[in-house]
């Protein structure tokens, strides 16, 4: 889809479909009023008949209005004045896209810039709008014998006042990069596990480096992981025929002496639970257990597209967790790269076992910040549901920055504590630490486990178990989160 920004009067624009907003109580914004005047009150007449109440997301298509170059006018309800928030604005945008998809026109122009969205300026409104539209165009039908019909719509133009055009352009540019990153994340998450395994992800990284020249990729194999002393990482992979990989991504958009930000992604390409086997019902969704790593891919794609002036490192800890005669057993003790020993009480608490070695590996980059992203605990879904990611960290300023980024990007997180009392749940009589802390506060104790390997830098942990994918039903699939949050965090660091 091509997105453009133009500063023209809506009544003079030649387009297949002109989109205008109408509030409840027949409220017309400046753009709708201009078109209404040009058509001799055609819009007002329709509203007086009660064909459109103006509730958020209601649509009404008008054909061939007089004195317009637009072939059609699509009216969309914007709700009550001064009550339009992010959620309602996204609903409005989705309703517009749903209608446009069913039309024959190859282009459309959206005159929505005069809508007041609470707490959002022209830049933020444009970004929210374009991101919603672009993400709404996503289709995954790679393995369908009957593909989706090609979309007739090829171009969307945002109409903006001249004073706002630069801000709208920038918002649109950022949104397209974020949406492209989300699409990559969703594609990788939605792939079947017989295709998407650790070696495949290494090849995908190399492919991304070919697309963007500023990206360097190194793929560490099983031999190298053993040389590094990553006993915890290797323990997760030892039951599978698929070899593990630590994928290292490096982008240098700033001066070489500027410390990088590091993103660490959990990449369990399929999680059976290992010897601590999961129930069969819903196990197919454990292909999404690599969505942390997929979100690092997606965030890198967005950063590379925007060419942000920052230095960024990605560490993707990729393995498959399978039961076999050679698999790790409950009760096994392994030595991590840090030298700390871990008693593995449950092989289904494997994400933290690959992440801990990756977090130790991150030390060599002398980072400004390290953020790990993982579909780590079912307890996070119990605590926060599927709307909000869990967030913990050892530096309050970093945590606040991520919370702020999530609010702006409409990809929110919520902070959970890492009090010392929770650390005691991880005590082991046989090793330095146990990999689970009992039934209470499971998300927090998982964060406590990771914190033991992140003491040499500012670190935060995002638990995306509830937000990375949608379970069951027709909408089942990866969401692309938290690419918007992470990209916004890096945009702010690049200023």
From Swiss-Prot:
Role played: Presumably involved in the processing and regular turnover of intracellular proteins. Catalyzes the removal of unsubstituted N-terminal amino acids from various peptides.
EC nos: 3.4.11.1, 3.4.11.10
Protein name, UniProt field: Cytosol aminopeptidase
Keywords annotated in UniProt: Aminopeptidase, Cytoplasm, Hydrolase, Manganese, Metal-binding, Protease
Record family assignment: Belongs to the peptidase M17 family.
Cofactor note: Binds 2 manganese ions per subunit.
Organism: Pseudomonas aeruginosa (strain ATCC 15692 / DSM 22644 / CIP 104116 / JCM 14847 / LMG 12228 / 1C / PRS 101 / PAO1)
GO molecular function: aminopeptidase activity; manganese ion binding; metalloaminopeptidase activity
Lineage: Bacteria, Pseudomonadati, Pseudomonadota, Gammaproteobacteria, Pseudomonadales
Residues reported to bind Mn(2+) 1: 271, 348, 350
PROSITE patterns in the record: CYTOSOL_AP
